[in-house]
Curated annotation (Swiss-Prot):
Keywords: Carbohydrate metabolism, Hydrolase, Magnesium, Metal-binding. The keyword Lipid metabolism does not apply. The keyword tRNA processing does not apply. It is an enzyme of class 3 (hydrolase). InterPro entries: Glyco_hydro/deAcase_b/a-brl (IPR011330), YdjC-like (IPR006879). This is Carbohydrate deacetylase. CDD domains: YdjC_like_2. Belongs to the YdjC deacetylase family. Its EC number is 3.5.1.-. GO terms for molecular function: deacetylase activity; hydrolase activity; magnesium ion binding. Probably catalyzes the deacetylation of acetylated carbohydrates an important step in the degradation of oligosaccharides. Mg(2+) binds at D14, H134. The active site is at D13 (proton acceptor).
Amino acid sequence: MSRPRMRLVVTADDFGYCPRRDEGIVEAFLAGAVTSVSLLVNGAATESAAELARRHSIPTGLHANLSEGRPVGPARRGASSLLGPEGFFLGKMGFREAVAAGDVDLPQVREELEAQLSCFRELLGRAPTHADGHQHVHVLPGVCQVFAEALQAYGVRFTRLPLERGVGGCTWLEAPARAFACAVERDARAAVGPFSRHGLRWTDAFVGLSTCGRHMSAHRVSGALARVLEGTLAGHTLTAELMAHPGYPSVPPTGGCGEGPDAFSCSWERLHELRVLTAPTLRAQLAQDGVQLCALDDLDSKRPGEEVPCEPTLEPFLEPSLL
């Protein structure tokens, strides 16, 4: 059998958000379309999700959450720079704005991250296979440093670096979505240093900013992976991660992280991703392109002709995305 051109981890985010979401994620995993999940420990269905992960031996990491719902750490007991007046996190953009303004106390971020890592260990009986950030909070300035420190302290080696080659030229993305994707990429580039200094590792490439929700299709996923493979030497195998959000739509009031489910979770877009990921079209295209699905644990040892995921392999993917 010829060596694959790419070994791809397909990660389903937001595991534990609601039972219907989790049902779809498990369905995708059992179909071989998803190879890893990221668990929200403050999600409405966290405990049942952890049971599903154990039952089906699903590789599970932490989806560190600093932007949606209620905290699990000391912040839940009183005033915190992480929370609004109602005791909830500040929201996707609210948290970013607070970080940019210098209003977020980074030691409080560290406390919450450690609490979530501890909660994960209690739920699963082990450390996460990896940790990434809900709404990419883990690469924000300052936050990336304490995130890396916490992961190193808890023995977590793998993270996500959300740098997607060519995302700035993806004209199908609405202007706000494209601007957000490019902002995430700028933060991710700056996070390389802190992540490397604390021994964190990640796949050579990342895809998912351009293929989220309604924008996912077999053609776009394979196109994004093709951009990653451009210029790859013959006989060399790259590693990559595809971020995905499959599942069945949430039905209010069930779901969420303490505030109920958000609009995206209740929309048809989650089901759309599930159908794209599990359809024969995408699987056939990936096989034709020499892409082999795997879990992060499968990348833990170097094979002939490929690199162990780490910072030095990233250099070809660090060029800026153009708006």
